[in-house]
Design a protein with these regions (language model features):
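Phosphate-binding loop that captures ATP/GTP phosphates
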Residues: 158-216
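Cytosolic-facing regulatory segments adjacent to core modules
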Residues: 194-256
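Inter-motif core of Ras-like GTPase G domains
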Residues: 258-277
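Beta-strand-loop-alpha "switch" segments that mediate conformational coupling across diverse proteins
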Residues: 307, 320-348, 361
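C-terminal output helix
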Residues: 106-114
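Walker A/P-loop phosphate-binding motif and the immediately C-terminal alpha-helix
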Residues: 131-177
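Conserved acidic segment of CheY-like receiver
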Residues: 3-15, 19-23, 53-54
Length: 382
């Protein structure tokens, strides 16, 4: 168990002092620092090694979301408290980055239990609820790279969390081109260093995209390098990424081969992408049968319809009846906005955030984030 400094950010003085009295004599607590000024608290927290934060959200105020977003980039060891413990409040707490939620008045035994649990998590294992979200289609030309790039960018904006965008289309990846990046390292380089236990390569090997908390890992520089990557190395890569990034968005090839199956098997969610035409739907049907044969959980595979038009002859209900699955999301057809974004090497929201497709990707990312939180919220319900 690692010793920690506990930072209590709470507008209520009495509440701050009670929490301090509960925990100041615990063996693993170096110091308890109290703040009613959340901004000043954040400035001290980011200078601390292995901090634990107790953040009260009983009073909503301007800047709370911004402070919480910054805190998530410093530590995942965040406890959120509130006098309101409705389901909506718990969901909000988790969205703000809570590892645990405690209703007020906080009970000493609950607080000590949660602090003990967080103190026992080493920094390299902090991100325990990380999700691998793979965008996949078994047919080329469907637009999965566009979806992966823009979903990852919007997740970084919506959640304020660190998001990894990983190009595992090992022979013909395009993510770096889509975002006009020229990373000094690639996935082949990172995998080789991970084999040698150089886990500090994870951040160094990624290219940060502009001012977002989005980190890009490009495909191998040379096609022949892809041939030496093994399924075990994919497992090693994912295991390492999950220690650093709460969200990992993966783009991959359309192939069905051992590497592809390892990526799909290891993913928490698969954004299975298709378009509205008969050949694409038939291919989707075959692929879904493969997923069923591999015993994927029912909530693992999400159907995403790309280039959707309201006046399509084939309706969403027809697709759902054919595939035997509900459609999770529809991305509208907007060829010119997409091509402008690709040609400029930027995300769609940078071209036209208020276009139909810009709004769609923002709402898509919000839904993904909210649904992941919803999966976790049951354990926090009072």
């Amino acid at each position: 168990m690692q010793n920690s400094t506990v930072f209590v950010l709470d507008k209520n003085e009495n509440s701050r002092e009670i929490i301090k009295s509960f925990i100041e004599n615990l063996d693993f607590v170096n110091e308890v620092k109290l703040y009613d000024d959340f901004t000043r608290g954040y400035e001290d927290i980011k200078q601390s090694e292995n901090p634990i934060v107790i953040l009260d959200i009983s009073e909503d105020f301007a800047g709370l979301d911004e402070i919480a977003g910054k805190l998530k980039l410093v530590t995942s060891k965040i406890i959120i408290t509130s006098i309101n413990y409705s389901t909506n409040t718990i969901i909000k707490a988790l969205r703000l980055g809570a590892k645990e939620f405690l209703p007020k008045p906080v009970l000493r035994e609950d607080l000590v239990r949660v602090l003990s649990m967080l103190a026992s998590i080493s920094p390299e294992n902090e991100v325990s609820q990380s999700k691998i979200i793979t965008v996949y289609s078994n047919k080329g030309g469907i637009g999965k790279t566009t979806i992966a790039v823009n979903l990852a960018a919007e997740l970084a904006k919506v959640t304020k969390d660190k998001v990894a965008l990983v190009d595992l289309n090992l022979q013909l990846g395009d993510i770096s081109t889509f975002l006009n990046l020229n990373p000094p390292f690639d996935v082949n380089y990172v995998i080789r260093r991970l084999i040698d236990k150089e886990e500090n390569i994870l951040i160094k090997g990624f290219e940060k995209y502009k001012d977002l908390s989005l980190y890009v890992l490009s495909d191998p520089s040379y096609i022949e390098q892809s041939e030496s990557i093994t399924t075990q190395q994919i497992t090693t890569l994912f295991s390492a990424l999950k220690k650093v990034f709460p969200y990992i968005v993966v783009d991959m090839s359309s192939n069905i081969d051992p590497i592809s199956l390892k990526i799909l098997d290891s993913s928490d969610w698969i954004m299975f992408t298709t378009i509205v035409n008969i050949p694409a739907i038939r291919n989707a049907q075959r692929c879904l049968n493969l997923f069923r044969s591999r015993k994927y959980p029912s909530n693992k595979v999400k159907i995403v319809i790309n280039r959707y038009m309201e006046n399509d002859e084939i309706k969403i209900e027809d697709i759902e009846n054919t595939l035997g699955e509900s459609v999770y999301w529809k991305i509208p057809n907007n060829y010119f906005t997409i091509m402008e974004a690709i040609n400029k090497g930027v995300s769609i929201s940078e071209v036209n955030a208020e276009s139909n497709i810009g709004n769609s990707f923002r709402d898509f990312a919000a839904k993904v984030s909210d649904d992941i939180i919803e999966q976790s919220v049951v354990q926090y319900r009072v």
